[in-house]
Swiss-Prot record:
Gene3D superfamilies: 1.20.1260.10. Keywords: Sporulation. This is Spore coat protein F-like protein YraF. The keyword Membrane does not apply. The gene is yraF. It is found in: Spore coat. Belongs to the CotF family.
């Protein structure tokens, strides 16, 4: 692996990794919203607020379903195939370790040789 964190070659496949990460985070947030709305619904006495929360709960469940279906269609999530999901989780863990081991802030970051003058020169 090229250890130069500014080299564009190190960004190969990053958009795909980012998409899966964002989708999983969105799914988790949608699930969290459904859970929090359900708790709020059980603790509300006002009929108007209960109706509003019930509507939000249904919308949250629909959003969760939509995100899940998108992830399944793109093969980013395998809720019914545990061995496939395990492989994805292992790959994710491997990538996390790889990024964690990258020297993202090397001692030498001087890129002065890449430019013919400093920014202050006109």
């Amino acid at each position: 692996m090229n250890n130069d964190h500014l080299d564009p070659i190190n960004s190969l496949n990053v958009p795909e990794l980012a998409d899966t990460t964002f989708a999983m985070d969105f799914l988790i947030r949608a699930k969290e919203g459904v859970r929090n709305t359900a708790v709020a619904l059980t603790e509300t006495a006002s009929p108007d607020v209960r109706a509003l929360l019930r509507k939000q709960l249904m919308q949250g469940i629909a959003m969760h379903q939509e995100i899940t279906e998108l992830m399944i269609s793109k093969k980013w999530f395998h809720p019914y195939e545990l061995s496939e999901q395990y492989k994805l989780d292992q790959l994710s863990a491997k990538n996390t370790i790889m990024v964690g081991n990258m020297n993202l802030f090397p001692d030498e970051t001087n890129r002065k040789g890449m430019f013919d003058r400093t920014p202050d020169e006109h």
